[in-house]
Amino acid sequence: MAAPVVSGLSRQVRSFSTSVARPFAKLVRPPIQIYGVEGRYATALYSAASKQNKLDQVEKELLRVAQLLKEPKLAASILNPHVKRAIKVKSIGDLTAREKLSPITTNLINLLAENGRLNNTPGIISAFSTMMSVHRGEVPCTVTTASALPEATLSELKTVLQSFLSKNQVLKLEVKTDPSIMGGMIVRIGEKYVDMSARTKIQKLSKAMREAM
């Protein structure tokens, strides 16, 4: 029973990808593949924007849409499943006109409204942002410490982390504090994960002592 739904979605996405770019061209693949409904729409959007050299513009517009969707009044009118689709389409039309969004972004939002998939909008925006991050060569890195690092230590840490990247990659660093790790740090960079926290060291020591007894 699920096959017709998936097939219909595929047709809609392909139609969107080509509806804003003429002549019809081969789909431009994003630098990273994201699955699911959000991934399909984001891929089509990336392809359409890439063909018109408007990736940066579309990304900025989507970030603006994401901000607008956080407004309680707007969210209640277009994300509420009990609101009639026709009303949502009208609200979206007013929004895109007021914000003067590009045809690419407007077509996406209108398509989501017409197909009853506006609730997928935040996920689609997130997927597109991930694609753009990889497109720019950004490598996400999260460093968690028990307390805030001094500026000198943070600067040295950035230099060390950057040394692990290739020349065309850019470090996108996020620093968090979590007193529960007790000391040391936890580093997640790309797909690599290194736990050097005092908490983990204590847990390993405790386990080793129990096994030795």
UniProtKB/Swiss-Prot annotation:
UniProt superkingdom: Eukaryota
InterPro entries in the cross-refs: ATP_synth_OSCP/delta_N_sf (IPR026015), ATPase_OSCP/d_CS (IPR020781), ATPase_OSCP/dsu (IPR000711)
Motif (SIFI-degron): 5-23
GO cellular component, one term: proton-transporting ATP synthase complex
The record's account of how the chain is modified after translation: In response to mitochondrial stress, the precursor protein is ubiquitinated by the SIFI complex in the cytoplasm before mitochondrial import, leading to its degradation. Within the SIFI complex, UBR4 initiates ubiquitin chain that are further elongated or branched by KCMF1.
Pfam families assigned: OSCP (PF00213)
Transit peptide location on this chain: 1-23
Keyword Ubl conjugation listed: yes
Modification sites for N6-acetyllysine: 54, 60, 70, 73, 100, 158, 172, 176, 192
Location in or out of the cell: Mitochondrion; Mitochondrion inner membrane
Keyword Signal attached: no
UniProt KW keywords: Acetylation, ATP synthesis, Hydrogen ion transport, Ion transport, Membrane, Mitochondrion, Mitochondrion inner membrane, Transit peptide, Transport, Ubl conjugation
Gene3D superfamilies the record matches: N-terminal domain of the delta subunit of the F1F0-ATP synthase (1.10.520.20)
Main location per the UniProt record: mitochondrion
Residues with PTM N6-succinyllysine: 90, 100, 158
GO MF, any single term: proton-transporting ATP synthase activity, rotational mechanism
Protein role: Subunit OSCP, of the mitochondrial membrane ATP synthase complex (F(1)F(0) ATP synthase or Complex V) that produces ATP from ADP in the presence of a proton gradient across the membrane which is generated by electron transport complexes of the respiratory chain. ATP synthase complex consist of a soluble F(1) head domain - the catalytic core - and a membrane F(1) domain - the membrane proton channel. These two domains are linked by a central stalk rotating inside the F(1) region and a stationary peripheral stalk.
NCBIfam families (UniProt xref): ATP_synt_delta
Self-association state and partner proteins as the record states: Component of the ATP synthase complex composed at least of ATP5F1A/subunit alpha, ATP5F1B/subunit beta, ATP5MC1/subunit c (homooctomer), MT-ATP6/subunit a, MT-ATP8/subunit 8, ATP5ME/subunit e, ATP5MF/subunit f, ATP5MG/subunit g, ATP5MK/subunit k, ATP5MJ/subunit j, ATP5F1C/subunit gamma, ATP5F1D/subunit delta, ATP5F1E/subunit epsilon, ATP5PF/subunit F6, ATP5PB/subunit b, ATP5PD/subunit d, ATP5PO/subunit OSCP.
Family: Belongs to the ATPase delta chain family.
Protein name as annotated: ATP synthase peripheral stalk subunit OSCP, mitochondrial
Organism of provenance: Sorex araneus
Gene designation: ATP5PO
